Amino acid sequence: MRINPTTSGSGVSTLEKQTLGRIVQIIGPVLDVAFPPGKMPNIYNALVVKGRDSAGQPINVTCEVQQLLGNNRVRAVAMSATDGLTRGMEVIDMGAAISVPVGGATLGRIFNVLGEPVDNLGPVDTSTTSPIHRSAPAFIQLDTKLAIFETGIKVVDLLAPYRRGGKIGLFGGAGVGKTVLIMELINNIAKAHGGVSVFGGVGERTREGNDLYMEMKESGVINEENIAESKVALVYGQMNEPPGARMRVGLTALTMAEYFRDVNEQDVLLFIDNIFRFVQAGSEVSALLGRMPSAVGYQPTLSTEMGSLQERITSTKEGSITSIQAVYVPADDLTDPAPATTFAHLDATTVLSRGLAAKGIYPAVDPLDSTSTMLQPRIVGEEHYETAQRVKETLQRYKELQDIIAILGLDELSEEDRLTVARARKIERFLSQPFFVAEVFTGSPGKYVGLAETIRGFQLILSGELDSFPEQAFYLVGNIDEATAKAMNLEMESNLKK
């Protein structure tokens, strides 16, 4: 018997009468626990081990039941280090799944997998909690309309638009602007959609998580003066944590996002960095649970585990969860089972290019490599589709001509090709834009560009109306009117110098 988990404290739910078991075996992060006959916990129930180690230090380890072994024994995975645990220690069955705080109290705070704050800013209001395991929304609850999720970022909205309630893969190495792009999306969804964001750091470096937190405070995404006005909740399960924590931290972040969608009826942005680490943690646990490994040593339940997470990320009639997932590709092998399983769920891919970052074009989104299932005339309309295709054709032609330009120079090209190159260079620069979250570094105010404005701007460049303008006029501006004004200023400056 248990009290409703939605009214209980953080971490796990309270009980009227607790069932006690004892540890009979410990293998790394996996415990076998024996319970009295007829008092077996359910799969996914939280178990808590409390006691003292041999040095007299207090121990408080939460585990999750994964298997029922028979003979009144269960196998559970620990959510924190099992150092100091010994056979014979008492284990409490909490009677329900791990529950975490949800709602406005989570904004601006950092949590671990159990929903405990780890930012030293005091306790969190735990009057509303939710279990991390639940079913995906029923088919009847889903919102089946195909709608574009406008981000205000030109290159994304024009060439690889995001779907409202869709899943986007973000591919990029270190130092190409992934974090800044993530922060800009968090900022824009708060301003344009009145929504909030949840960031799930799954198996990432502690340093990166700390850097992200500091940058969010600096750029105002997390409001230090009034924490309730922050636009994001952070959930971290870092690289140094046991596989149980890394395997479940994605579900903790998703549970917080689901509350904003279902109860507050908001549009939510859910970031998972990195989805590969979720699979990797599942693989580590799978072997310890005694399952036979599948292809390349991955767990045989890979598709099921991925599906149970991804199917909960969707649009309902109340609101939407749009998910952006950083995807690490092991050894750049796209056929590896982990990325291959992830691709099956993605609606769009945003690829960040080191070459563009080296040119100083930010956001460094590769316009030719990034894709979206939304870029179809029946969804985005003929005008948007035609403009996007012509932009891609122009950039593709420029890419083909680059070898010739490098060897022979621009003068050897035909008149038509020279015009294409000039327009492509303008397009390339116009795809850059100043970000709100980068204002503190660049000094130039951020710009949110609506989709209609974006399309109009690229149509004007493609039509040839702006051929006389210098290409630097298109660099780091918002809409096309700003580029025109910048061109006029550049012309006036050059006339004054003469």
From Swiss-Prot:
Q: Which domain of life is it from?
A: Eukaryota
Write down the SUPFAM superfamilies for this protein, in alphabetical order.
Answer: C-terminal domain of alpha and beta subunits of F1 ATP synthase, N-terminal domain of alpha and beta subunits of F1 ATP synthase, P-loop containing nucleoside triphosphate hydrolases
Catalytic activity reads: ATP + H2O + 4 H(+)(in) = ADP + phosphate + 5 H(+)(out)
Which Pfam families does this chain map to? ATP-synt_ab, ATP-synt_ab_N, ATP-synt_VA_C
The Gene Ontology biological process annotation of the record reads:
proton motive force-driven mitochondrial ATP synthesis
Q: How does it sit in the membrane?
A: Peripheral membrane protein
Which EC number(s) are documented for this chain? Answer: 7.1.2.2
* UniProt entry tagged with the keyword Transcription regulation: no
Q: Which residues bind ATP?
A: 172-179
What subunit structure does UniProt give? F-type ATPases have 2 components, CF(1) - the catalytic core - and CF(0) - the membrane proton channel. CF(1) has five subunits: alpha(3), beta(3), gamma(1), delta(1), epsilon(1). CF(0) has four main subunits: a(1), b(1), b'(1) and c(9-12).
Function statement: Produces ATP from ADP in the presence of a proton gradient across the membrane. The catalytic sites are hosted primarily by the beta subunits.
Q: Which family does the record assign?
A: Belongs to the ATPase alpha/beta chains family.
Task: List, alphabetically, the HAMAP family matched.
Answer: ATP_synth_beta_bact
What is the protein name given in its UniProt record? ATP synthase subunit beta, chloroplastic
Organism expressing this protein natively: Montinia caryophyllacea
